[in-house]
Regions:
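A short acidic, Gly/Pro-enriched loop at the edge of an enzyme's catalytic core
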Residues: 109, 170-181
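Conserved alpha-helix/loop element of class I SAM-dependent methyltransferases that forms part
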Residues: 71-112, 122-126, 130
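Conserved SAM-binding strand-loop segment of SAM-dependent methyltransferases
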Residues: 157-170
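Hydrophobic beta-strand segment of the Class I
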Residues: 113, 182-183
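Short, glycine-/aromatic-enriched active-site segment of Class I SAM-dependent methyltransferases
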Residues: 218-237
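Short alpha-helix
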Residues: 238-254, 258-260
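A short glycine-rich, Lys/Arg-flanked "PGG" loop and its adjoining helix->strand segment in the class I
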Residues: 195-210
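Conserved SAM/SAH-binding beta-strand->alpha-helix loop
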Residues: 143-145
Length: 288
């Protein structure tokens, strides 16, 4: 799970003809965008409803509306996924990420990997290929429709070393000291209490275990109007916090943080000419 795009435009049909976003029958009209205000529903309720619609339709157009919203394949290729990864797991790729955390994780055969906000299973399945038969991948997501889609995809792609659990990343349904690697792709920004997420991550990681994360952070504070916009919440913007605050939270939770890369052009890629002070941060964080 990750960013619901506000983009509109053509699908990448030539590179991803099987992707759900590229199926004409899945295109959702602009008559269905989010209309609720932040005051009427909690952030978690808004996110759950929005991503439930994405899971059911296979497109972020279910929430934002407009064309094909960029195409999952094109967006995924732009943040680092290979053509082979995209083509072989097309139904699991909803184009909701802001990076490629699996490539940061250095996953080994036999590892236990936890995916925070696992969505339709794309990153979880890529990790499952690396952990092999002796390893295990656990995906946690709070949206029932996403979990159903992920489990359906696990059967379709024949992954028996992946388990999807319903839960909140602020209160993980995972045992203490049981995970080698935690990965997450454009999800932690959606959590209202990020400090809790990092404390929970520290709890479930084994000694020396690490996080490998791509996430949206702010380069400067948003306006009140931007903070209160539910569409920007679901698009991984209004729930984001300042980069320095994000890193400080990780350190306070007991992690040694290494910033691997940062994409300050993500705003233009996602929103075109709309100027939003966001960056896609790629980092690892090792449990001390």
């Amino acid at each position: 799970m990750g960013a619901i795009m506000l983009l509109s435009g053509c699908c990448c049909r030539d590179c991803c003809r099987h992707n759900a976003c590229c199926r004409e029958e899945k295109t959702v009209k602009r008559s269905e965008p989010i209309t609720m205000t932040m005051k009427k529903k909690s952030a978690k309720e808004i996110i759950k409803e929005a991503y439930g619609k994405v899971a059911e339709t296979g497109s972020s157009c279910a929430v934002i509306g407009g064309g094909c919203c960029g195409g999952g394949c094109a967006l995924s290729a732009d943040v680092g996924y290979t053509r082979e990864e995209i083509d072989t797991l097309a139904d699991a790729n909803l184009g909701l990420g802001c990076g490629h955390p699996v490539s940061l994780a250095d996953i080994k055969p036999g590892n236990t990997v936890l995916d925070l906000g696992s969505g339709a299973g794309f990153d979880a399945f890529l990790a499952a290929r690396k952990v092999g038969e002796k390893g295990k991948v656990i995906g946690v997501d709070m949206t029932p429709a996403m979990l159903a889609k992920a489990r359906e995809n696990a059967k379709k792609y024949k992954f028996d070393n992946v388990e999807f659990r319903q839960g909140d990343i602020e209160k993980l349904p995972v045992e203490d000291n049981s995970v080698d690697i935690i990965m997450s792709n454009c999800v932690i920004n959606l959590a209202p209490d990020k400090a809790k997420v990092f404390k929970e991550a520290h709890r479930v990681l084994k000694s020396g275990g690490k996080m490998a994360v791509s996430d949206v952070v702010l380069l400067k504070k948003l306006t009140k109007e931007q903070k209160d916009d539910p569409k920007l919440l679901c698009a991984c913007v209004s729930g984001a916090i300042l980069k320095d605050d994000y890193i400080d939270m990780l350190k306070k939770a007991g992690f040694e943080v290494t910033v691997v890369d940062e994409d300050k052009t993500i705003n233009k890629k996602w929103f075109g000419d709309e100027k939003l002070p966001i960056s896609s941060l790629k980092f690892t964080a090792r449990k001390k």
